[in-house]
Swiss-Prot record:
InterPro entries: ATP_synth_b/b'su_bac/chlpt, ATP_synthase_B_chain. F-type ATPases have 2 components, F(1) - the catalytic core - and F(0) - the membrane proton channel. F(1) has five subunits: alpha(3), beta(3), gamma(1), delta(1), epsilon(1). F(0) has three main subunits: a(1), b(2) and c(10-14). The alpha and beta chains form an alternating ring which encloses part of the gamma chain. F(1) is attached to F(0) by a central stalk formed by the gamma and epsilon chains, while a peripheral stalk is formed by the delta and b chains. It comes from Nitrobacter winogradskyi (strain ATCC 25391 / DSM 10237 / CIP 104748 / NCIMB 11846 / Nb-255). The chain crosses the membrane at residues 34-56. The keyword Glycosyltransferase does not apply. It is found in: Cell inner membrane. Belongs to the ATPase B chain family. GO terms for molecular function: proton-transporting ATP synthase activity, rotational mechanism; proton-transporting ATPase activity, rotational mechanism. F(1)F(0) ATP synthase produces ATP from ADP in the presence of a proton or sodium gradient. F-type ATPases consist of two structural domains, F(1) containing the extramembraneous catalytic core and F(0) containing the membrane proton channel, linked together by a central stalk and a peripheral stalk. During catalysis, ATP synthesis in the catalytic domain of F(1) is coupled via a rotary mechanism of the central stalk subunits to proton translocation. Component of the F(0) channel, it forms part of the peripheral stalk, linking F(1) to F(0). The b'-subunit is a diverged and duplicated form of b found in plants and photosynthetic bacteria. This is ATP synthase subunit b 2. Residues 1-25 are annotated as: Disordered.
Length: 185
C-alpha cells in the first residue's frame, strides 16, 4: 500500500510528454496561439467598451466636477483677496486720515498751549517788573535812609575821634563837610 501511494503520487505530480520531455506551458503552445489571440482581443474589446461606457464617463464627470470646484474655489479666493485688498486700502486711508486729524489736533493744542504759556509768561514778566520796580524803590529809599543814618553816624564818629585825639570839640560844619566830601569821593 505504501508503494502504491508513492507511485500514485509520482504519476500525478509530473506531467511528461512522450519520450520524457516536458510539455510547454499551455499559453505558449503553438496550436492554441490563434484562439488565445482571438480570446484576448474579445476580452480587451469588451473591457474597453465597458470602461468607455461606464467607468470612463464617471471618471470624466468626477474630474470635471473637481475642476469646476477648483475653478470656483479659485474665483472665490480671488474675490475674497480683492475684497481684502480693498478693505486694506480703505483701512490704510482711514488710518492716514486719522493720523492727519491727530496731527492737526496736536498742532492746534500745541499752538493753544504755547499761546497760553506766552500770555502767562508776559503777565508774569509784567508782575515781576512791577515787583522789581517796587523793590528798586524800596532799596533806593532804604539806601537813602541808611546813607542818611551813615552820614549822621560818620559825623558823630568823626567828631568823637577828633575829640579823643585832640581833646577839643571840632566844629560840626567842618565835620559835616569832611564827611560829605569823603562819602562822595
Amino acid at each position: 500500500m505504501a508503494e502504491s501511494h508513492g507511485n500514485a503520487h509520482g504519476a500525478t505530480a509530473h506531467t511528461e510528454a512522450d519520450g520524457g520531455h516536458k510539455a510547454p506551458f499551455p499559453p505558449f503552445q503553438k496550436e492554441t496561439f490563434a484562439s488565445q489571440l482571438v480570446s484576448l482581443t474579445i476580452a480587451f474589446v469588451a473591457l474597453y467598451l465597458i470602461s468607455s461606457r461606464l467607468a470612463l464617463p464617471r471618471v470624466r464627470q468626477t474630474i470635471d466636477d473637481r475642476e469646476n470646484t477648483i475653478k470656483g474655489d479659485l474665483a472665490q479666493a480671488q474675490k475674497l483677496k480683492d475684497d481684502s485688498d480693498a478693505a486694506l486700502k480703505a483701512y490704510e486711508a482711514e488710518l492716514a486720515a486719522a493720523r492727519a486729524r491727530a496731527q492737526a489736533i496736536g498742532n492746534e493744542t500745541r499752538e493753544k498751549l504755547n499761546a497760553a504759556a506766552e500770555a502767562e509768561r508776559k503777565a508774569l514778566e509784567e508782575r515781576l517788573s512791577v515787583k522789581l520796580a517796587d523793590a528798586e524803590k524800596t532799596i533806593a529809599s532804604t539806601r537813602a535812609a541808611a546813607m542818611s543814618n551813615v552820614r549822621g553816624i560818620a559825623s558823630d564818629a568823626a567828631t568823637a575821634i577828633v575829640q579823643q585825639l585832640t581833646g577839643a570839640t571840632p566844629d560840626s560844619k567842618l565835620v559835616d563837610s569832611a564827611v560829605d566830601a569823603s562819602m562822595k569821593g
